[in-house]
UniProtKB/Swiss-Prot annotation:
Annotated catalytic residues: 508 (proton donor/acceptor)
GO MF assignments: alcohol binding; alkylglycerone-phosphate synthase activity; FAD binding; flavin adenine dinucleotide binding; identical protein binding
The protein's Enzyme Commission number: 2.5.1.26
PANTHER family: ALKYLDIHYDROXYACETONEPHOSPHATE SYNTHASE, PEROXISOMAL (PTHR46568:SF1)
Binding-site positions, substrate: 447
Name recorded for this polypeptide: Alkyldihydroxyacetonephosphate synthase
Name of the top EC class for this enzyme: transferase
Important for enzyme activity as annotated region, ranges: 544-546
Classification via PROSITE patterns: FAD_PCMH
Length: 611
């Protein structure tokens, strides 16, 4: 690399140390019980122990079997192991490879301590967290390298290719399908932590594009762009703890996708370092010169190489940003309104629709509002029940967002509100929208609390047509609850629509249950297979935005067809002949495809390895 090499600023080192190694998100943010009441509260960096007075009762109601409602509800303690009590095999040694690395990288860019290796072994799926919480850490990477530049990544990949070293890119570590987990300890494995590559390199206000290092985390990306008056406008649920590179590598989708598009719509070009050379694309509005090469890398999950820099479309920081809440009498009313809005060509920035069960969760998630607000809420409920004939067991909350120039927002708001009114929606004003905007990244923290108390929660998401949307929604919920309750295990499931298109939506399921007595993986595997098979039954996609990793590989041939799998396999063999780039992810091996070896996530021969 040309130029003088400088020490990296200490305040930016090791972001993985600021994120929970055995849970979700900020180490300073968590749910806990207040004593002696048992009320569940939330602590954040800004405020301590905010009571959520309805949440405990909600959990009891939904995770109690019929006939057991009068039994005492005890939140059993099932704490995670402390890191000092977790065994991790020592890293393998590869002196020749490491010697050449040390000639090019600073000592501070190479890590092999226990915390670094554990945090670069797993993502944040339920299966990941269960394993790390009980100390089942296998195949931890032997070394973590933290590059500063494209040139350093090039050098690292060249050395990995030379010495046949496995390389796995790591962004924020929020993936939930096994995309960043090393799957074997046969070869020396390096996790490439991209988070020091966190700069907006330039912004072109005329073309409205920006060149960005892809290790930048969501909040820092928007902070740097805002200084130059622009925004990317991409904020997935993982926004606080994910990177631009992760978004590109998994075909991410953000809350504002209805207006700005998904990540592939924002990407103009990028640089990708592969074992056989660096791939670069020309910038431009579009090209008709052959296949769309950027789509070879988009969604490739590090299996072809390492994305280092990307030119992205940006837009001016919006003049007006508004969010509003509405209640629909039923899910069917909400879907009808949503489809009419998409057909009207007057599209909000964001439309989210919560089904009745998730609507009740959102109500239970709220802190106490005070006597006046509670009285007002009670009066609204009476009005909706007696005058509008709303059944509160069926009501659905919706959050609608608008961004842009004030006049444009005014026009879109008026048009959209008219459609909502014609579909029996009741306006709640801007307060629910403001609350959603402030708390939109908080819900994942409930999973850590449930795991600490002998319960679990997981998710499944898909793209489904409007024709099949409601039948999939009903069948999945009924089948899931029945499957577990028939075994004497309480279960709960909800869903929301998070992204909309003219020909379908993203339907996102959240489901929970109590852990079984064996504390094994049976329930997780059953739930994963059950939900994925139901999604396929109704023509849904294998994933809308979570990706494939290795957990979805068992379904990939069924989803993508063997022909496309072979095309991708041939491409990988050409670009990555030694299979050093994130092996056994995204597509099945030939042996897996022909039933000569089990899948890494073996849902086909459903076996339940006891943990």
């Amino acid at each position: 690399m040309s130029g003088e090499k400088k020490e990296y600023p200490k305040e930016h080192i090791d972001l993985y140390q600021q994120i929970k190694w055995n849970g979700w998100g900020d180490t300073r943010k968590f749910l806990h019980q207040l004593k002696p009441s048992g009320t569940i509260a939330m602590t954040t960096p800004e405020v301590s122990s905010v009571p959520l007075p309805s949440l405990r009762g909600f959990i009891k109601k939904e995770l109690t079997l019929p006939g057991e409602e009068d039994k005492p509800f005890v939140l059993d303690e099932t704490p995670a192991l402390q890191i000092e009590n977790i065994h991790v095999d020592p890293p393998k040694q590869y002196p020749e490879f490491v010697r050449e690395l040390k000639a090019f990288f600073l000592p501070d860019q190479l890590k092999d301590d226990k915390l670094a290796r554990i945090t670069h072994t797993f993502g944040k799926s339920l299966r990941d967290l269960i394993r790390v919480r009980i100390g089942q850490v296998k195949n931890a990477p032997d070394l973590i390298v933290l590059p500063h530049s494209h040139e350093e990544v090039e050098r690292l990949v060249q050395l990995a290719h030379k010495y046949n070293v496995v390389i796995i890119p790591m962004g924020g570590g929020s993936n939930i399908v096994g995309a960043i987990e090393p799957v074997s300890n046969e070869r020396f494995t390096v996790s490439i932590d991209m988070r020091r590559m966190n700069k907006v390199l330039w912004v072109d206000r005329r073309e409205m594009t920006a060149c960005i290092q892809v290790g930048i985390m969501g909040p820092e990306l928007e902070k740097q762009l805002h200084k130059q008056g622009v925004s990317l406008g991409h904020d997935p649920d993982s926004f606080e703890f994910s990177t631009l590179g992760g978004w590109l590598a998994t075909c991410s989708s953000g809350h504002q996708s209805d207006k700005y598009g998904d990540i592939e719509d924002m990407a103009v070009s990028f640089r990708t370092v592969t074992p056989t050379g660096t791939l670069e694309l020309r910038n431009g509005a579009r090209s008709g010169a052959g296949i769309n090469y950027k789509h070879i890398i988009l969604g490739s999950e590090g299996t072809l190489g390492i994305i280092t820099e990307a030119v992205m479309k940006v837009h001016a920081v919006p003049q007006a940003v508004e969010y509003y809440g509405f209640l629909f009498p039923t899910f069917a009313h909400a879907v009808s309104a949503l489809q009419q809005i998409r057909s009207s060509e007057v599209i909000p920035t964001m439309i989210r629709v919560y089904d009745p069960e998730e609507t009740q969760l959102s109500f239970a998630w709220k802190p106490s509002k005070g006597a006046v607000s509670e009285f007002t809420s009670a009066m609204v409920k009476k009005y909706l029940h007696y005058i509008r004939s709303f059944d509160f067991k069926n009501v659905c909350l919706s959050i609608i967002g608008f961004e842009g120039p004030k006049k444009v927002v005014d026009f879109h708001r008026t048009s959209v509100f008219d459609i909502l009114s014609k579909n029996a929606a009741f306006g709640l004003g801007s307060a629910p929208g403001k609350t959603w905007a402030e708390k939109r990244y908080d819900l994942p923290y409930i999973r850590d609390f449930l795991l600490d108390h002998n319960m679990w929660v997981d998710v499944a998401e898909t793209t489904v047509s409007y024709a099949n949307l409601q039948t999939l929604w009903k069948d999945a919920k009924q089948t899931f609850v029945k499957h577990f309750k028939d075994q004497g295990i309480p279960a709960w499931i909800c869903a929301h629509i998070s992204h909309t298109y003219t020909n379908g939506v993203c339907l996102y399921f959240i489901f929970a249950s109590k852990q079984n007595e064996n504390k094994d993986m049976a329930q997780y595997i059953e739930a994963k297979k059950l939900m994925t098979d139901i999604i396929f039954k109704y023509g849904g996609s294998l994933s809308h935005h979570h990706g494939v990793g290795y957990e979805h590989v068992p379904w990939m041939t069924r989803y993508a067809t063997r022909g496309w799998i072979n095309v991708y396999r041939s491409l990988k063999e050409t670009i990555d002949p030694k299979d050093i780039c994130n092996p056994r992810k995204l597509i099945p091996t030939i042996k897996e495809e022909n039933n000569k070896e089990p899948f890494l996530f073996d849902v086909v021969n459903v076996k339940y390895p006891k943990l």
